[in-house]
């Protein structure tokens, strides 16, 4: 009986170790293979918040066709780094079109993000690469999503899965992000790991 319990314990330990390893791999993949889009409004005034969304739409649309052809996060980051002056020009021109004279700063950087829930998927907390666009003084509310892969474009979960899979995300991670039944614990652990990562990153 004792030997049986020992064997069962060893089997459970192996299974748990494998499962934990896949969760850690998912956390690393999220941090390395997603590029978030972070647009910061000049203020919380209604018009500044509207301008933030106009800039978001203009920048997203200007990059969409090129980013859809990219299947590697490293290539996407290099592309965005090279395009920073162009992105700034798109954002600046959008503001000018609507009569706003605010300046715009654009950068590709590492940022701390809280857990976010979108229409078709959720992202756990953690440190991510981000295309950061700051309008004016940058004192207003933020808009966060994902610029690569284009997870914020599809209107349905099936679209989200297809886009994520095209970027090389494994099925388990896709199911975790769209909230498939049975993956809640996995998402919770990813979120907890991300929050811990945020604490150390902020030190």
Question: What is each model feature region?
Answer:
Residues 19-33:
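Aromatic-capped interface at the extracytoplasmic side
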Residues 6-23:
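Hydrophobic membrane-insertion alpha-helices, especially the h-region
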Residues 77-146:
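Mid-length scaffold segments of soluble, non-membrane domains
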Residues 120-183:
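Soluble extracytoplasmic domains of inner/organellar membrane proteins
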Residues 179-203:
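Short flanking/linker segments adjacent to small metal-binding domains or redox-active Cys/His motifs
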Residues 69-79:
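Internal, well-folded beta-alpha domain core
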Residues 32, 36-69:
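Short extracytoplasmic
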Residues 56, 60-68, 85, 89-96, ...:
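Sec-exported extracytoplasmic/periplasmic mature domains
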């Amino acid at each position: 009986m004792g030997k049986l319990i020992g064997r069962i314990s060893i089997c459970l330990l192996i299974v748990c170790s494998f499962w934990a390893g896949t969760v850690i791999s998912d956390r690393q993949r999220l941090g390395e293979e997603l590029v978030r889009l972070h647009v910061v409004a000049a203020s919380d005034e209604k018009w500044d918040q509207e301008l933030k969304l106009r800039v978001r739409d203009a920048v997203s649309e200007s990059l969409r066709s090129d980013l859809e052809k990219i299947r590697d996060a490293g290539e996407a980051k290099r592309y965005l780094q090279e395009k920073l002056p162009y992105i700034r020009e798109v954002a600046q021109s959008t503001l000018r079109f609507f009569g706003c004279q605010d300046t715009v700063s654009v950068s590709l950087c590492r940022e701390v993000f809280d857990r976010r829930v979108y229409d078709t998927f959720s992202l756990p907390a953690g440190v991510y690469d981000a295309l950061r666009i700051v309008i004016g003084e940058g004192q207003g509310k933020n808009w966060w999503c994902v610029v690569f892969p284009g997870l914020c474009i599809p209107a349905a979960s099936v679209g989200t899965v297809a886009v994520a899979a095209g970027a090389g995300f494994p099925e388990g991670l896709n199911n975790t992000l769209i909230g498939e039944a049975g993956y809640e614990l996995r998402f919770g652990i990813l979120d907890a790991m991300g929050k811990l990562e945020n604490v150390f990153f902020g030190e």
